[in-house]
UniProtKB/Swiss-Prot annotation:
Belongs to the TRAFAC class translation factor GTPase superfamily. Classic translation factor GTPase family. EF-G/EF-2 subfamily. PANTHER family: RIBOSOME-RELEASING FACTOR 2, MITOCHONDRIAL, TRANSLATION ELONGATION FACTOR G-RELATED. Keywords: Cytoplasm, Elongation factor, GTP-binding, Nucleotide-binding, Protein biosynthesis. Catalyzes the GTP-dependent ribosomal translocation step during translation elongation. During this step, the ribosome changes from the pre-translocational (PRE) to the post-translocational (POST) state as the newly formed A-site-bound peptidyl-tRNA and P-site-bound deacylated tRNA move to the P and E sites, respectively. Catalyzes the coordinated movement of the two tRNA molecules, the mRNA and conformational changes in the ribosome. Residues 8-283 form the tr-type G domain. GO terms for molecular function: GTP binding; GTPase activity; translation elongation factor activity. This is Elongation factor G 2. The gene is fusA2. Pfam families: EFG_C (PF00679), EFG_III (PF14492), EFG_IV (PF03764), GTP_EFTU (PF00009), GTP_EFTU_D2 (PF03144). It is found in: Cytoplasm.
Length: 677
């Protein structure tokens, strides 16, 4: 058998989950057992290596994706630890775009939680193969098989339990490996470093045999080789099983399921084995696709150092005042000190240093190639979503989609000295975070920051003071609205004026129609653009686009509208781009007024998990907030309530929910749609 290539021995994986499922603890154990960390960091002590921002250590949650590299079984594993809090969904989205595989962590007590579903569907969107780890098997209420059942009900991929627990809750001792037909137990004295495989005890044999049969039946449905041997009653070897599980996992037909307790140091090494055995190397994923920046011809790049360079910038961070750009290299190579080409901006930039990251520590590299995830210093122009490539063989990869902010807050510098720092700090934070928006309100002389939720803005404000020494006074959070129209209208805009010594003319007729909620904006030319000079066409579109952004009535962006450009009148010697831009803008504003402009507010999908005894209080509170209950699902002693609630009614909800349920309920929310309140 030929030796494996370096690429085939790389794994780019993410660790993703709902908040508090224990994924940072899983990451810490992985670093410890692979020798990258000499001391186990605990989240509850604020010592987790991967959670290196002060805000993360105080809150015990992960905010920005930390990247680290470790080695296991002669394979190089690049791990991105991602946040589970919905306010930081963008971090998960960015990570999944550049990963090849994911470890999804579930809480054995809570099961499939709302954010677990969100991240799972995000992974599906990018076709990322997954393995599942059911964590916290030592906790009271842990139920492995219930979580597997929930996965089956909620997700399209079929869960394949390749382990079952040896005991549960305070009786959790280890796992039964259904592939090897052995029990795996861990030595507490060595903090789980030492573990052993042994024969299955007699009282667990029947249970193990029955679950292995289920595993074989599931595999037989997706793999002909296994089906043939299974039906013939032939023995199925360990290598047969590993091959079949790998192929089905890579095809996203199955998700291998494992279990353990990261906090109690049980179950992590088999997860590392599964990462190596079942998740893809860069060679296993399809070639990355893009277009030629000039000709728009479709192109692809295979994962090979022999191909021309193609890479995607997926994250920007400030590190001690210097900009670090995280890059996934899909093909080719890059060297420290060489010039790189930004295909979208058509600019060359020098990569002064290449770094391999370990959370917030680093190792300098001379070069990096296909399959690597590295941090680059020296890229001043490059931002998240930009393509880096070979200038002679350019390719533009698909950029990244970002969510629109739903909440805003006014801030003002405490002193004139803070004001100078504030402007620079916000520019740097916006570079890092594409979901953070900043604008200056001329009327109130306040800076308004907008983001994905209260926690998101809290962290931004905290970082302004802590990292940039820019201290601010904070206003109350405000909801970001949108506008649309109720009725179809036919309107005209006319502009005719002498400015200086030149006459300017423009005449535009538009039809505005309301569209379905969430369907966006559509601009359609009905007038014949072939007879119009290109600068007039551009001016009409600019007039409409600018009015869409600045709003027609209340100053909010206009959404869910179809704009048909029916006529563009010409006047020889007087027609001008200024005239058409103003006429189009005037027609659009007039149309919004006549079409009965209405305000839309963000509606959030809220999921509350509460003890059943507080269900009535929680539902009553949601109704009082003008929420609409979608489903109520009993979950043992708990109950899951899903509802749609206007964001403006949710400020301070976490405090109210805590006091109504004695701190025993948890909730998540994420943007659902803009609609009338």
């Amino acid at each position: 058998m030929p030796p494996k290539s370096r690429l085939s021995r790389i794994r780019n994986i993410g660790i993703i989950a709902h908040i508090d499922a224990g994924k940072t603890t899983v990451s810490e154990r992985i670093l410890y057992y692979t020798g990258k960390s000499y001391k186990i960091g605990e989240v509850h002590d604020g010592e987790a290596v991967m959670d290196w921002m002060p805000q993360e250590q105080e809150r015990g949650i992960t905010i920005s994706s930390a990247v680290t590299t470790c080695n296991w079984a002669n394979h190089e594993i690049h791990i991105i630890d991602t946040p589970g809090h919905v306010d930081f969904t963008i971090e998960v989205e960015r990570s999944l775009r550049v990963l090849d595989g994911a470890v999804v962590v579930f809480d054995a007590v809570a099961g499939v939680e709302p954010q677990s579903e969100t991240v799972w569907h995000q992974a599906d969107k990018y076709g990322v193969p997954k393995i599942a780890f059911i964590n916290k098997m030592d906790r009271v209420g842990a139920d492995y098989f219930r979580v597997v059942k929930m996965m089956k009900e909620r997700f399209a991929s079929v869960p394949l339990p390749i382990q079952i627990p040896l005991g549960q809750q305070d009786q959790f001792l280890g796992v039964v490996d259904l592939i090897r037909e052995k029990v795996v137990t861990w030595d507490d004295g060595s903090k789980g470093v030492n573990y052993q495989y042994s024969e299955i005890p007699g009282d667990r044999e029947a249970d193990a045999k029955a679950n292995r049969e289920i595993m074989l039946e599931i595999l037989a449905e997706v793999d002909d080789g296994i089906a043939e041997k299974y039906l013939e009653g032939e023995e199925i070897s360990e290598s047969d099983l590993l091959r079949a599980i790998r192929e089905a996992t890579l095809a996203n037909r199955l998700v291998p399921v494992m279990c353990g307790s990261a906090l109690k140091n049980k179950g992590i090494q088999p997860v590392l084995d599964a990462v190596v055995n079942f998740l893809p190397s860069p060679e296993d994923v399809p070639p990355v696709r893009g277009i030629h920046p000039a000709t728009k011809e479709e192109l692809s790049r295979a994962s090979s150092v022999k191909e021309p360079l193609s890479a995607l910038a997926f994250k920007v961070m400030q590190d001690e005042g210097r900009k670090l750009t995280y890059i996934r290299i899909y093909s080719g190579q890059m060297k420290a000190g060489e010039e790189l080409y930004n295909a979208g901006k058509k600019k060359k930039e020098k990569a002064s240093r290449l770094l391999k990251m370990h959370a917030n520590k680093r190792e300098r590299l001379e070069q990096a190639g296909a399959g690597d995830i590295v941090a680059v210093m020296g890229l001043k122009e490059t931002v998240t979503g930009d393509t880096i490539c070979d200038e002679k063989n350019p390719i533009l990869l698909e950029s990244m989609e970002f969510y629109e902010p739903v909440i805003s807050q006014a801030i003002e510098a405490k002193t004139p000295a803070d004001q100078e720092k504030l402007s620079l700090a916000l520019l740097k934070l916006m570079e890092e975070d594409p979901t953070l928006r900043v604008k200056y309100d001329e009327e109130t002389a306040q800076t308004v920051i907008s983001g994905m939720g209260e926690l998101h803005l809290e962290v931004v404000i905290d970082r302004l003071g802590r990292e940039f020494n820019a201290h601010v006074n904070v206003g109350k959070p405000r909801v970001v609205h949108r506008e649309t129209i109720r009725n179809k209208v036919d309107v005209e805009g006319h502009f005719e004026r002498e400015l200086g010594d030149k006459k300017h003319f423009g005449h535009v007729r538009l039809v505005l129609e309301p569209k379905e909620r969430g369907s966006g904006v559509e601009i359609e030319w009905k007038a014949d653009t072939a007879i119009l000079p290109a600068e007039y066409v551009k001016a009409v579109e600019e007039g409409i686009q600018e009015s869409l952004v600045s709003g027609a009535v209340a100053g909010y962006p206009v959404v869910d509208i179809r704009i048909k450009i029916l006529e563009v009148g010409l006047k020889e010697g007087e027609s001008s781009p200024i005239g058409y831009k103003i006429a189009a803008s005037s027609a659009f504003r007039d149309g919004c007024i006549k079409g009965e402009s209405v305000l839309l507010q963000p509606i959030m999908a809220v999921n509350v998990i509460t003890p059943a005894e507080f269900m009535g209080d929680v539902i009553g509170d949601i109704n009082a907030r003008k929420g609409e209950i979608q489903t109520i699902t009993p979950k043992g002693a708990m109950c899951e309530i899903r509802a749609l609630v206007p964001l403006k009614a949710l400020f301070g909800y976490s405090t109210d929910l805590r006091s109504a349920t004695q701190g025993r309920a948890v909730f998540t929310m994420q943007f659902y749609a803009y609609d009338q309140g």
